[in-house]
Amino acid sequence: ESMGRNLMASPYAGTIVAIEALVSSASEQQKSEWLPKIVEGAIATMAITESDGSWDLSQIEAMGTVIGDRLSLHGSKCFVTDADCAEFMVASIRLDDEVKLVMIRRDEIPDNAIIREIVIDQTRRSFQVQLDGIEIPLSQVLPKSDLKAIELAAMLMLCAEISGGLVGVLHSIVEYLNTRKAFDRYIGSYQSLKHPAVDILLRLEAMRSHLYHAATNLANNDAPAAEIALRMAKAHGAEAFAFAGDRAVQFHGGFGFTFECDAQLYLRRALWCQYQFGDEKYHR
């Protein structure tokens, strides 16, 4: 939440989701090899979104072909955050008509296979990764493929970021409403500006309740209840964050449309979060 509130550009979320992928799907030998590296400071990321941007993680086009004791990869992944600096990534592929997760080291990926994407939020270092021609040892194939655990972990991190972002943008709005004067009155005294600010606060509290409920259920290993709460949090929070970002830009007037105003940064982050792992219509 604090990272979202301050619009922190960090590989933290991707690394945490990669940890969840290892914990839920890797063998004990793989865990003992990869998890200590993360503890020591290694950056990891996830490559689970196909080139068509599908929100269904089971719809996988990337393929793997076994050649001796190695696996040849084909296809591409998009929206891979921090791919250029991650020491390894967890990617989803289809192998013998089964969904598999594989570990790919950074030194196994050619530099020209990592392409920076132009996205609405440039604080997000998003890349497309071309898998064609990449070969990895079969020992880097995870024995399980718990996509549901990965999705829940990713949505929890994303919803926490949305919750923090709502706090940050609301503070930005309130500060400006209590600073800017028009016709010798603070603009925050006008009803047309006060009411949307209150609406944002109410949406924030509702979304945060869903988020904390989901986190509690995950901690208690109640995945079905956690999924319901997370979908409610994502649907409610993504819509609220986009609305709050838009109001922040509008309330700041012409200044809000410039790069010098932080309001546009919140709007960009809101639009990025809104379409990660499904928008509000998808989850409802």
What is the role of each PLM region?
Residues V23-A26, T65, A91-R94, M103-R106, ...:
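Short beta-strand-to-turn element immediately C-terminal to the catalytic PLP-Schiff-base lysine
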Residues I43-V66:
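A gly/ser-rich beta-alpha-beta helix-loop segment of oxidoreductase catalytic cores
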Residues S76-A113:
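A short core secondary-structure module
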